[in-house]
A protein has these predicted regions:
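Flexible loop/N-cap segments at domain edges
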Residues: 115
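Switch/coupling loops of ABC transporter nucleotide-binding domains
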Residues: 21
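Helix N-cap at the start of a conserved alpha-helix in ABC-type nucleotide-binding domains
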Residues: 2-4
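A short, surface-exposed alpha-helical micro-motif characterized by mixed small hydrophobic
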Residues: 33-35
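H-loop/switch region of ABC-family ATPase nucleotide-binding domains
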Residues: 27-28
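Conserved beta-strand-loop-alpha-helix hinge in the C-terminal portion
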Residues: 47-74
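Conserved catalytic/dimer-interface elements of ABC ATPase nucleotide-binding domains
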Residues: 41
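Helical segment within the ABC ATPase nucleotide-binding domain
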Residues: 6-18
Length: 115
């Protein structure tokens, strides 16, 4: 349940911030972790495909077409825009971060699907 997952990860993050506790989460739905993740280890076929700060590991995942769908949707959009438009966008943790970058770069979102 998405609301339960969001609440759980927020609680775990609050514990981390309050007590400085290291938290290790195994999660396939990265969208839930996006606001909180700091570092990430990505496994592919039992091998480490990326191990770094989230902002450094995510582009490595994006380059691998098998791993790309596992990225949070917001970062799939971000990295796709950076690739297509040769931009260096911020480290989006929320839709508000994305909208702020859109405003900064004059990107206008239109309804429908971009191909």
């Amino acid at each position: 349940d998405p609301d339960g997952a969001q609440s759980l990860y927020k609680l775990v993050y609050d514990i981390h911030k309050r007590y400085g506790t290291t938290i290790v989460a195994v999660e396939h739905r990265m969208d839930y972790l996006l606001p909180y993740v700091t570092d990430m280890i990505v496994l592919k076929e039992g091998e480490v495909a990326a191990a770094d700060a989230f902002e450094a590991a995510a582009p490595k995942m994006y380059e691998d077409k098998a791993l790309r769908p596992l990225l949070p949707a917001l970062w799939q959009i971000k990295l796709g825009l950076e690739e297509k438009l040769s931009l260096d966008l911020g480290d989006w943790r929320s839709e508000q971060d994305a909208l702020a970058d859109f405003k900064t770069y004059g990107i206008v979102a239109k309804e429908g699907r971009a191909d």
